[in-house]
């Protein structure tokens, strides 16, 4: 029962990264988001989640993991309620940020609770296996669940669905999970705030550039403030006795390379889900449920890639899988750039999506191993937490860069399509366009497809960068694996 409670919490947190993707077109129409600002629905969650993840783990150590776990779950429930009731874009984004905060408190604590609740050996290993499976499959489950909820109810239920789940978790936790010992320590709140604010400003700068151009004053101010904030963050962490981000983790070449690869791959992955969801619903006219089902093969092929990597890692080592995985991801994304308004799911989307997923499956197993390589048991929680935080921050930053590419290509294509539309439009269509500024299909489909293709080009570049980092930075032979795994046992987090 304890494992069920912990796994349910992790599923709820992971699921919310993707469940809103299917609802994005409906959220856009309901709350009047622009296509470029729509990415904040994803980024508001992932930025606070990634930025505060390590602080959440530290809070569990100092205040007691069960207590902090319940608080994080209840905060997540409250944020889900507020998000479901949102009447405008600002209210929804504030609720999504609050959700990310709740997830950042609950998620690292739930992993640590496995270490304190289950005995070392097969029992604990089985628990970690269930936790990992839920973490890996949660994204695909979120897409399918989002499709069902939007199709049968409305977009608000992708948030409301968390409320009964969270309440049951909060009620069951005191009965089935024991409180852990408290460990004295300090909260590096300054470091957490500087890193989160710095990343938010950086992401805002890219999204602002997509809307108003690179010379816009607020765009430049955002980038400047982001540089100041992130520089201050590094200086604070170097001087802190108990930093939220242990900078010595980056001293190891292999581990630093691993974090760089995760940063690039997360950018590619978040972009693929975000823009492909828009494409299949707006251009291919898939219903929300059809869109959710369209992504189901992703999780199956990721599992196949992970299985292949796990089986042959002892023979070849992690580096070949990190290189090949990045190349496969890049090939899949480059293939997706060929989609146009005449594309079909089976002919133009499914194939590249499967190639991309196979590469990602190979990558994640290798990245997890390398992130925990040569790490003392007492620091495994920090190492794994840093990998998770890198994934969330990389996804947010990468998505904002892709949105910039999307917005630029969108605007260029619109300049081509508007004259064509005006030549062929009826008086009623012209009047509607002058009133709303929105092109109708098929002209709007051409504009969206041009933007999506540009975003996929940038995503493919991120995947190529991941492969190049693996070639240059990762230096592990198969004979080193026994030594690496010896220091990577589950830690208290």
Tell me the role of every PLM-derived stretch.
Residues 1-175, 316, 327, 334-337, ...:
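Transmembrane-helix bundle of Major Facilitator Superfamily
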Residues 3-49, 154, 190-191, 204, ...:
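Transmembrane core module of solute transporters
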Residues 27-28, 59-60, 148-153, 206, ...:
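Interfacial helix-cap and linker-helix signal at transmembrane-aqueous boundaries
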Residues 63-73, 86-90, 94, 106-110, ...:
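C-terminal module of multi-pass small-molecule transporters
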Residues 151-160, 208-219, 287, 408-461:
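A membrane-interface helix-boundary motif in multi-pass transporters
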Residues 163-180, 196-207, 226-240, 466-476:
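C-terminal membrane-cytosol helix-exit motif in multi-pass small-molecule transporters
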Residues 182-186, 242-248, 412-417, 478-488:
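Short, Lys/Arg-enriched, Gly/Pro-containing loop segments at transmembrane-helix junctions
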Residues 440-445, 473-493:
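Intrinsic disorder in cytosolic terminal tails and internal cytosolic loops
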